[in-house]
Swiss-Prot record:
Pfam families documented for this protein: GAD (PF02938), GatB_N (PF02934), GatB_Yqey (PF02637)
Entry GO terms, CC: cytoplasm
Subunit details: Heterodimer of GatD and GatE.
Catalytic activity: L-glutamyl-tRNA(Gln) + L-glutamine + ATP + H2O = L-glutaminyl-tRNA(Gln) + L-glutamate + ADP + phosphate + H(+)
The protein's name in its UniProt record: Glutamyl-tRNA(Gln) amidotransferase subunit E
Region (Disordered): 415-437
Gene this protein is translated from: gatE
EC id: 6.3.5.-
Function: Allows the formation of correctly charged Gln-tRNA(Gln) through the transamidation of misacylated Glu-tRNA(Gln) in organisms which lack glutaminyl-tRNA synthetase. The reaction takes place in the presence of glutamine and ATP through an activated gamma-phospho-Glu-tRNA(Gln). The GatDE system is specific for glutamate and does not act on aspartate.
Entry keyword set: ATP-binding, Ligase, Nucleotide-binding, Protein biosynthesis
One of the GO BP terms on file: glutaminyl-tRNAGln biosynthesis via transamidation
A GO molecular function held by the record: aminoacyl-tRNA ligase activity
HAMAP family (alphabetical): GatE
Recorded family membership: Belongs to the GatB/GatE family. GatE subfamily.
Length: 635
């Protein structure tokens, strides 16, 4: 289904997209009875080095091997309340957590999937330090789910229940610090088939899955609790895994940018092949051109030489004019080279961007002469300690050879602007082997039946209900559900609050405060207490905004305390009448001249005195009545 606004004809390009959505569950840890809370309190630390192991087939995963080559030491910070021996890898796992398993089954049914009869846990090799054990435990909970979209059906082949990784605190050159509070938080992983053929379709599928997850009321909320990964490919291109897409609305743009990147890489490939270059033409030959830059004005190069480093160059035959070619807005083939080299050096220089960065045309000409470059040939420079410079240039050579072949398969990181950058090679299948510490878990038919018969409402069903039963505006109802305020809304309505008022305060008032104060400090209990005061006649609805502002700044205070301290408790009707009479007396000449036309002026001045302390409707009624009495009942 092509749309008029499409940048590309995705059908012609053979676009295929698959989603992987991970969401934290709000239960205990998956294999220990430890709370899943986060804390900055550190009671102890320990360190580990991790090494790759072979799979059942005797193979080593390429992504794990690349991580190992970095030679990093991992420091782990723990808290006695939030970490136990299981997640220090000093004790066998327990569980899995019964509640987490039941929530995963709920999600499976909401996504039209079929739960398995027995759950078998596997170990997935992960040696970037985020798992102390060097592996992540994961199991398939259900298969054969589906999502219906206007473009067609998208399959959900697997729904898994696995452990989340440790929280990264600091990354240094040879050391990474992790905190263990997040390690072991249950994570549901939902994978779709690559049957998504349009960027907007991917967004629709992701939203439906997100709605099903939220419907359980057992998923965590907030930044980092959901991670969306995309697998994107086009005809002639390659499968690219894009990690860490945080925002739903960014999904179409990220897919569009990846399509653009692959198309441009294919154009570069075609041009390189037209020029007659082959991968074997790129030699691992390093040219020491340090003396060319003895008096350079480039601060980066001068600093490297001063530290005892060297300036090394490589020759890339037939690449001139292509390294600087844009492949995504603001990113070039040279950026791809730099991404690969970054594990060894902060950056690289290439011929298409020079002279620049303090490097003169004379220095460029001398490097061209030293390397014996032809008109179509290019060079790449690195200034660093010799071995680091060589390793960085080896990465550039590898990526340049891939450019001649086409689009390399790899895992990339989503960037805030919709572009992506290189992370690591695409993981192979050689990273899984059986978990020997956890026996198979049989799922009783009775449990399946009970869960299936008591499924929660999907968000869209709730929106329709709120519009129909509570007469809410559709956009207000949708926002209420999207912001996950619907459960609190229903509690407030059960307390006796008018649905329109409850929805307005939760959506309009609280959202309006977001730019002024940290509204995440306002808990559901704070909100319910404020509404209790309103129902008791202690505060006016105009007081909510001021009370919530103060709670956001001082979350340890109660709504009642703030109402009393700020003088927001409701005035009696007699007190309101007295203030109205005072205001009318102060403006009696205006009242005599304008009659009922003075209503707006009097209301404004009264409300300036009683806002938050009196109901606006009551004030309006009394003002109108008093003015009618004064002007002889005129309207």
């Amino acid at each position: 289904m092509m749309q008029m606004s499409d940048k590309f004809n995705y059908e012609e390009l053979g676009l295929k997209v698959g989603l992987e959505i991970h969401r934290q569950l709000d239960t205990k840890k998956l294999f220990s009875p430890v709370p899943t809370k986060f804390s900055d309190e550190v009671d102890f630390t320990f360190q580990r080095r991790l090494r790759p192991t072979m799979s059942e087939l005797g193979e080593v995963d390429p992504a794990a091997l690349e991580e190992f080559k970095k030679g990093r030491v991992f420091i782990y910070e723990g808290n006695y309340q939030l970490t136990d021996l299981v997640y220090m890898d000093e004790e066998p796992p327990r569980g899995p957590d019964k509640e987490a398993l039941e929530v995963a089954l709920q999600i499976a049914y909401l996504l039209n999937a079929k739960p398995v009869d027995e759950v078998y846990y596997m170990r997935k090799i992960v040696i970037d330090g985020s798992n102390v054990s060097g592996f992540q435990r994961t199991a398939i909970i259900a298969t054969d789910g589906k999502v219906e979209t206007p473009w067609g059906t998208v399959g959900i082949p697997t729904i898994c229940l696995e452990e989340d990784a440790a929280r990264i605190i600091e990354r240094k050159e040879k050391e990474v610090i992790y905190r263990l509070d997040r390690l072991g938080v249950p994570l549901v992983e939902i994978s779709t088939t690559p049957d998504i053929h349009h960027p907007e379709q991917a967004k629709v599928v992701a939203k439906f899955i997100g709605d099903a997850l939220r419907a359980t009321r057992k998923v965590k909320r907030g930044l980092g609790t959901i991670r969306q990964d995309l697998n994107v490919s086009i005809k002639g291109g390659a499968r690219i895994e894009i990690k860490g897409v945080q925002e739903l609305d960014m999904i179409p743009l990220i897919i569009e940018r990846e399509v653009e990147r692959q198309l441009n890489l294919l154009k570069i490939r075609d041009e390189l092949q037209r020029r007659g270059v082959r991968p074997e033409d790129i030699k691992e030959e390093f040219y020491d051109v340090t003396d060319v830059f003895t008096n350079t004005k480039s601060k980066i190069i001068a600093r490297a030489i001063k530290k005892g480093g060297k300036v090394l160059a490589i020759k890339l035959p037939k690449f001139r004019g292509l390294i600087g070619r844009e492949i995504q807005p603001g990113r070039r083939l040279g950026t791809e080279f730099a991404d690969r080299a970054r594990k060894y050096v902060p950056g690289i220089f290439h011929i298409d961007e020079l002279p620049n960065y303090g490097i003169t045309q004379e220095e460029v000409n001398e490097v061209i002469k030293r390397l014996g470059l032809g008109e179509e040939d290019a060079f790449v420079l690195v200034a660093a300690e010799e071995e680091r410079a060589k390793n960085a240039l080896r990465e550039v050579i590898k990526r340049a050879k891939e450019a001649i072949i086409g689009v390399p398969e790899e895992t990339r990181r989503a960037l805030p602007d919709g572009n992506t950058e290189y992370m690591r090679p695409l993981p192979g299948k050689a990273r899984m082997y059986p978990e020997t510490d956890i026996p198979p878990i049989r799922i009783p038919d009775e449990l399946k039946r009970k869960i299936k018969e008591n499924l929660p409402e999907l968000p869209q069903v709730k929106v329709e209900k709120y519009v129909r039963e509570y007469k809410l505006d559709r956009s207000l109802a949708q926002t209420l559900v999207d912001d996950e305020r619907d459960e609190l809304f229903e509690e407030l309505v059960q307390m006796g609050v008018k649905p329109s008022l409850a929805a307005s305060i939760l959506v309009v008032v609280l959202k309006g405060l977001r730019k002024e104060v940290p509204i995440e400090n306002i808990s559901d209990e704070h909100i319910k207490e404020a509404f209790s005061l309103y129902l008791e006649g202690k505060i006016a609805k105009e007081a909510f905004e001021e009370i919530f502002k103060e709670i956001a700044r001082n979350p340890n205070k109660t709504a009642r305390q703030i109402a009393e301290e700020k003088g927001l408790t409701l005035l009696s009707e007699d007190e309101v009448r007295k203030i109205i009479d005072e205001v009318i007396e102060q403006n009696i000449e205006v009242v005599k001249n304008k009659g009922m036309g003075a209503m707006g002026l009097i209301m404004g001045r009264v409300m300036a005195k009683v806002r938050g302390k009196a109901d606006g409707k009551l004030v309006s009624q009394i003002v109108k009545k008093r003015l009618q009495e004064i002007v002889g009942g005129g309207v």
